[in-house]
Design a protein with these regions (language model features):
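Substrate-binding/catalytic lobe of Class I Rossmann-like enzymes that use SAM or dcSAM, i.e.
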Residues: 182-294, 300-305
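Conserved class I S-adenosyl-L-methionine
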Residues: 76-84
Length: 306
């Protein structure tokens, strides 16, 4: 069932398709997402330290882990690009906790509007800039680090090289990229007849982690770390399902019963997929390959990430 519910599309990644698909999925309304995601307003896998960790705490822990992998804790004022920034949660965390200067880009009008409101409400306007912009339109800018959380699923294998090349071109020496994405299991595959492709992610394509690491290295990155958070996404989705059930009447009033049931099925089946290892999710850390002297600027161990 998971294979039927969660599939991939062969025609993804173009600007026009991306804009239409992102609007279809994310412009369902900020209030609906608030009911499902909770006050964290973060639509990606969280990181649960233990069974007592709340969803809000787990999302903050995920953001902190990414900040540390990117080295944002090493010095204040580093420039971060958050690709597919959603409602601004990662950007706000990096600015608030580490003094990072953040540019967040999204092609969802609803997300950009709400992200800007949240940034202003948090008093982070001097550090965080939210743009309604495609990441491919950032040529000429330079960043110390890039986070891409839950956006890679919209790229597609055919445009993966373009994606990594663009991001590499935006990084300076020793620049780091953290790619956080759901991975297919058993090779990248296409299924345009899947439930998720038809009703939830009309441009979604999951890529095998092996293809992802090969793609990164082929475009000038040195892959330094790969971590699976599979069990954590199962837990995250169970929290979202519980939130939707708790606020069912309000959700139906916002989006209609059919849409609410589609989301309930999609999230429940996804949770089962992660629980049964039919799906996976990986954080892949790459640095711009240094061909001059091989120095990386990386810590010797993962100890300071935890």
């Amino acid at each position: 069932m998971v294979a039927d519910v969660l599939g991939e599309s062969p025609t993804v990644g173009s600007v026009a398709v991306d804009e239409a698909s992102i609007s279809h999925h994310y412009d369902v309304g900020n209030e609906f997402y608030r009911l499902v995601l909770g006050e964290a307003m973060t639509y990606s896998c969280a990181r649960f330290v233990d069974a007592s960790t709340t969803l809000k705490e787990a999302q903050a822990a995920k953001h902190e882990l990414i900040c540390r992998k990117l080295g944002l804790h090493e010095r204040s004022g580093m420039r971060l690009l958050d690709v597919g920034c959603g409602w601004g949660s990662m950007a706000m965390h990096a600015a608030r906790e580490h003094g990072a200067r953040v540019v967040g880009v999204t092609i969802s009008e609803e997300q950009a509007k709400e992200a800007r409101r949240r940034v202003d409400a948090a008093g982070l306007g001097e550090l965080v800039e939210i743009r309604l912009q495609d990441y491919r339109d950032l040529s000429g800018e330079r960043f110390d680090a890039i986070s891409s959380i839950g956006m890679f699923e919209h790229v597609g294998k055919n445009r993966m090289a373009e994606y990594f090349n663009v991001l590499r071109s935006l990084l300076g020496p020793h620049g780091r990229l953290l790619n956080h994405a759901i991975s297919s299991v058993g090779g990248s595959r296409l299924n345009t007849n899947s439930f998720a492709y038809r009703y939830v992610f009309p441009d979604g394509e999951l890529i095998d982690i092996g293809d992802t690491t090969i793609g990164m290295q082929a475009t000038g990155f040195e892959v330094r770390d790969v971590e699976s958070l599979r069990e954590h996404y199962d837990m995250t989705l169970r929290h979202w399902v519980a939130n939707l059930r708790e606020h069912w009447d309000a959700a139906v009033a916002l989006v209609g019963e059919l849409c609410a049931r589609v989301w309930l099925l999609y999230m429940t089946a996804s949770a089962d997929g992660f629980e049964d290892a039919g799906l996976n999710i990986h954080q892949t850390l790459g640095i711009v390959r240094n061909v001059k002297d091989g120095s990386s600027g990386m810590p010797r161990t993962r100890r300071e990430w935890n």
